[in-house]
Amino acid sequence: MDRLDFSIKLLRKVGHLLMIHWGRVDNVEKKTGFKDIVTEIDREAQRMIVDEIRKFFPDENIMAEEGIFEKGDRLWIIDPIDGTINFVHGLPNFSISLAYVENGEVKLGVVHAPALNETLYAEEGSGAFFNGERIRVSENASLEECVGSTGSYVDFTGKFIERMEKRTRRIRILGSAALNAAYVGAGRVDFFVTWRINPWDIAAGLIIVKEAGGMVTDFSGKEANAFSKNFIFSNGLIHDEVVKVVNEVVEEIGGK
């Protein structure tokens, strides 16, 4: 079975489930705190994805946000709803993310945003696509031309935005790391900075950006993989400038 075709069809199927419940969720549970939440729809969506992978790829392992942390040379990485807060509040910027990793390298990734009817995907060596159309990162070579994005991180975000708003056209926070990263690949944003994040949030976006001609590193500027903790996704042309600003912020707040 073709893994990419399997992944796209599966996430679109799960997307139909999410749209039934989008903005209509009554039972919201806290995980690590009031900003880190989960719903029964997260769990149901994850079960759907896991069941299909177990059925068609029974010898392969799974890492999924809601409590599955297997390891292995052939690994599927799942985020059933990336942007649960947006999903619960009826905001459209949420996504389902699925990546396949072989021997530590991401081989394919799919990010599906059902409320936006957008599917972004890539497979190693085959390019990146948005609803079937080939995509490339932007060609903006000056920060003054750029729209960047980041997540909501205590200590880091405010200081990062303060610095970048003076240098860029604008900074946006979408609330879905997977979608944020994929949008770098689509050229919708020029860079995305994420801080202390998990593999299921960014694994699919990582290969989408790379296959779209972009660059993905950690905060030191070294090439990142799905299991790095801090990421800078960019079109490559303004990457060094973003690394510089990020490290100014990290130094100021005294953390890595």
Swiss-Prot record:
Keywords attached to this Swiss-Prot or TrEMBL record, sorted alphabetically, are: Carbohydrate metabolism, Hydrolase, Magnesium, Metal-binding
Q: Where does substrate bind?
A: 82-84, 172, 177, 196
| UniProt enzyme class | hydrolase
Q: How does its activity get regulated?
A: In contrast to mammalian I-1-P phosphatases, is only weakly inhibited by Li(+), since 50% inhibitory concentration for Li(+) is about 100 mM, and the Li(+) concentration required to totally abolish I-1-Pase activity is 1 M.
Which InterPro entries does this chain map to? Inositol_monoP_metal-BS (IPR020583), Inositol_monophosphatase-like (IPR000760), Inositol_monophosphatase_CS (IPR020550)
Which residues take part in binding Mg(2+) 1?
Answer: 65, 79, 81
Cofactors, names only: Mg(2+)
* Family of the protein in this entry: Belongs to the inositol monophosphatase superfamily. FBPase class 4 family.
The name this protein goes by in its record? Fructose-1,6-bisphosphatase/inositol-1-monophosphatase
**Can you name the source organism?**
Thermotoga maritima (strain ATCC 43589 / DSM 3109 / JCM 10099 / NBRC 100826 / MSB8)
Lineage, broadest ranks: Bacteria, Thermotogati, Thermotogota, Thermotogae, Thermotogales
Q: Which gene encodes it?
A: suhB
